[in-house]
């Protein structure tokens, strides 16, 4: 069990307003995505649509500017038809469709990959629902669930994004009672990664804010 953290005075009021609590809670039950049930053979879809930041990519990936969207959509459709249960291919088809302005068509594919606990898909579809990017429907409460789960599966963007969004009140109205100790564990795990400059700055900022919330000087 982790110790309960006393949040007093102004910090206590902030916690109530942000929907952040500090109960006695179990340590985060970290999960790991297992890609072994799915083919790891490189496909044309991987060549055209892998994301550089996807931890489960099988090639270095392409930025959105480097992608030929028509080609990516075509080859990913073909490859997914050959391997319909592969969450990596589902995600990459969804990525291509989203960039092409076809987010309504993309969402079922990325939701399918998220349901299979593909970390990149969980974070990205959560982000889409949070921001309404590419004209996707806004659903901040669903976003909270997905981004948190991506953090539990170790996705760096989720490990840093979820605490930041919670502390900034982005999930307000969702009935979320985020555990401060969980948020600290997310940030701590992210800190152990090989961070580039901007993520490292965000880690430092989040650590300061969490200490303030906990009343630790």
List the predicted regions and their residue ranges.
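N-terminal leader/linker segments that initiate helical-solenoid repeat arrays
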Residues: 25-75
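"A position-specific structural signal for the A-helix of alpha-solenoid helical repeats
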Residues: 92, 124, 161, 206-209
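Short coil/turn linking the two alpha-helices of tandem helical-hairpin repeats
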Residues: 50-53, 98-101, 126-137, 163-174, ...
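Terminal, low-structured helical/coil segments at or just beyond the last alpha-helical repeat
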Residues: 30-37, 41-44, 173-217
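Short helix-capping/linker turns of helical repeat alpha-solenoids
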Residues: 41, 82-87, 115-122, 131-133, ...
């Amino acid at each position: 069990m982790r110790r309960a953290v006393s949040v007093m005075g102004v910090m206590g009021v902030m916690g109530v307003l942000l929907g952040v609590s500090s109960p006695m809670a179990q340590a985060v039950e970290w999960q790991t995505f297992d890609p072994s049930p799915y083919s790891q053979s490189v496909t044309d879809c991987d060549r055209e649509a892998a994301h550089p930041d996807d931890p489960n990519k099988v090639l270095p990936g392409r930025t959105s500017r480097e992608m030929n969207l028509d080609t990516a959509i075509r080859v990913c459709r073909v490859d997914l038809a050959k391997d319909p249960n592969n969450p990596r291919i589902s995600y990459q088809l969804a990525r291509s469709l989203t960039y092409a302005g076809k987010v309504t068509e993309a969402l079922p594919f990325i939701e399918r990959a998220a349901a299979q606990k593909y970390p990149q898909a969980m974070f990205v579809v959560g982000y889409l629902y949070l921001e309404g990017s590419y004209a996707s429907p806004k659903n901040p409460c669903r976003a909270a669930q997905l981004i948190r789960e991506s953090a539990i599966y170790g996705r760096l963007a989720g490990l840093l994004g979820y605490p930041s969004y919670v502390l900034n009140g982005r999930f307000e109205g969702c009935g979320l009672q985020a555990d401060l100790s969980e948020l600290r564990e997310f940030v701590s795990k992210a800190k152990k990664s090989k961070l580039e400059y901007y993520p490292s700055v965000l880690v430092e900022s989040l650590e300061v804010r969490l200490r303030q919330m906990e009343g630790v000087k």
